[in-house]
């Protein structure tokens, strides 16, 4: 083999290895965009965790209304109202973070496709596009994992707000007693919402680990 052919072969191998190492996106800006996408996933995940805590707080305040109905449920009801408002606010933040994450992912994969379109080596380009399609499919699986949560949360939140209105007009012992069935339903449905949150959190962890390059833990 001539020196010139050897150099060309080594260059091709090096290019191929670099592409494989970064899952098809061999530029600094590319992995930074992947990190940004990972950060978006982490922020979305964090808001969902906050949502779980907000549900716990809401259910706790609802229980306190039931236990204090025969004495003085006013303070417990005020806390319940605050918890419902906080939960609604947190839900808005989850939606916002979800949109941010989606936009960052879209930018990441668009940049990846653009850069790989400029790659001259057909083998490298083919590998890169194959990896991109696989990871993009993984990223888009987040939306599917979020569907049960979206389907459950809206009706449950509406039920909580309706219960809040009911109690605000009838916080008597008899009124609270009459709403016991609604209390039980709110708790049961809230637990199902949290299960869907757990499933989505697990999916987000998996996707983030798949999309972003490995990073050493801080010492």
Residue ranges: model-predicted function:
Residues 29-40, 154-219:
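Long amphipathic all-alpha helical oligomerization modules
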Residues 97, 101-180, 213:
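Extended amphipathic alpha-helical interaction segments
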Residues 21-24:
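C-terminal motif of bacterial Sec signal peptides marking the signal peptidase cleavage site
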Residues 26-89:
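Immediate post-signal-peptide N-terminus of mature secreted/exported proteins
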Residues 27-29, 61-79, 111-130, 174, ...:
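Amphipathic alpha-helical hairpins
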Residues 86, 133-137, 185-189:
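A short structural micro-motif
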Residues 2-14:
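Bacterial N-terminal signal peptides that target proteins for export
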Residues 41-55, 84-87, 91-105, 146-153, ...:
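Long amphipathic alpha-helices with heptad-repeat character
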């Amino acid at each position: 083999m001539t020196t010139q052919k050897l150099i060309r072969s080594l260059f091709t191998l090096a290019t191929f290895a670099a592409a494989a190492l970064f899952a098809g996106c061999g530029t600094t800006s590319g992995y930074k965009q992947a990190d940004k996408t990972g950060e978006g996933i982490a922020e979305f995940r964090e808001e969902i965790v906050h949502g779980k805590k907000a549900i716990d707080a809401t259910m706790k305040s609802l229980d306190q209304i039931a236990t204090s109905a025969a004495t003085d449920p006013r303070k417990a009801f005020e806390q319940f109202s605050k918890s419902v408002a906080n939960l609604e606010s947190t839900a808005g933040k989850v939606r916002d973070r979800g949109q941010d994450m989606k936009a960052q992912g879209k930018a990441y994969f668009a940049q990846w496709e653009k850069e790989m379109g400029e790659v001259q080596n057909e083998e490298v380009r083919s590998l890169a596009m194959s990896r991109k399609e696989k990871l993009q499919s993984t990223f888009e699986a987040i939306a599917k994992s979020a569907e049960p949560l979206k389907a459950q949360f809206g009706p449950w939140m509406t039920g909580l707000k309706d219960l809040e209105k009911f109690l605000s007009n009838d916080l008597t012992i008899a009124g609270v007693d009459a709403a016991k069935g609604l209390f039980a339903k709110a708790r049961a449905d809230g637990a199902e919402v949290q299960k869907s949150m757990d499933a989505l959190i697990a999916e987000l962890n998996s996707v983030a680990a798949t999309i972003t390059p490995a990073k050493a833990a801080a010492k």
